[in-house]
């Protein structure tokens, strides 16, 4: 007769349970060893008793390497297979979010341009009006500031041009003053030369004309007509020479 079929359920007797655990554990470890030797397989076995005691078997020298290999083969493939699906799902959610924002911005732009205002209620219209007023004030403020900046630049250029004009005017006045000074000095020098050399020339001319009356030297009797001519000549030269008569002719 063979052994009867054992019902698989928890053994209630504590002693029998411990005996059965020890027998089956040893048999399991033996089967794992036989499998690794007969089939050249990498086998690792980990068993914990109900009290938390550890029993293990590993066909290799390091249990951790076998566990790392098991983790890569099991959980790594799951992560690799699930990664594209998760990325696709996240990308689709991001797409839906961006699409909603894009449609909202398009609707706001049309409302700002005065289009599609029918679906808006009174509160939304008031909010749109306040938004437009704020935008208009900001535009006017920026425009005013731009005009003030331009005015300031033009005033600065005006001051620069006025300073340059003033400098050129002063330079022109200095040049005109120097020119008048040189012209006045030239006229005064010419008058002094005329005054200095005018009278001696007249005197010398009178002297030469008086000597031309009778160039010959005579001793004794002189012709009376020649004396009269000399007197007339001396009188004419004295009138031309401003009344100057040499002393030897008197």
Swiss-Prot record:
GO CC, alphabetical: nucleus
Superkingdom of the organism of origin: Eukaryota
Q: Which residues form the MADS-box domain?
A: 3-57
Q: What sections of the sequence does the record tag as coiled-coil?
A: 85-150
List GO BP terms, alphabetically: cell differentiation; plant ovule development; positive regulation of transcription by RNA polymerase II
Location in or out of the cell: Nucleus
For the null mutant, the annotation states: Triple mutations in the SEP1, SEP2 and SEP3 genes result in the replacement of the stamens and petals by sepals and of the carpels by a new mutant flower with sepaloid organs.
Q: State the UniProt keywords alphabetically.
A: Activator, Coiled coil, Developmental protein, Differentiation, DNA-binding, Flowering, Nucleus, Transcription, Transcription regulation
Q: Taking every annotated instance into account, which residue ranges of this chain make up the domain K-box?
A: 88-178
Q: How does it assemble?
A: Heterodimer with AGAMOUS capable of binding to CArG-box sequences. Interacts with TT16/AGL32.
Biological role = Probable transcription factor. Functions with SEPALLATA1/AGL2 and SEPALLATA3/AGL9 to ensure proper development of petals, stamens and carpels and to prevent the indeterminate growth of the flower meristem. Forms a heterodimer via the K-box domain with AG, that could be involved in genes regulation during floral meristem development.
- What's this protein's name? Developmental protein SEPALLATA 2
Give the organism's phylogenetic lineage.
Eukaryota, Viridiplantae, Streptophyta, Embryophyta, Tracheophyta
Which gene produces this protein? SEP2
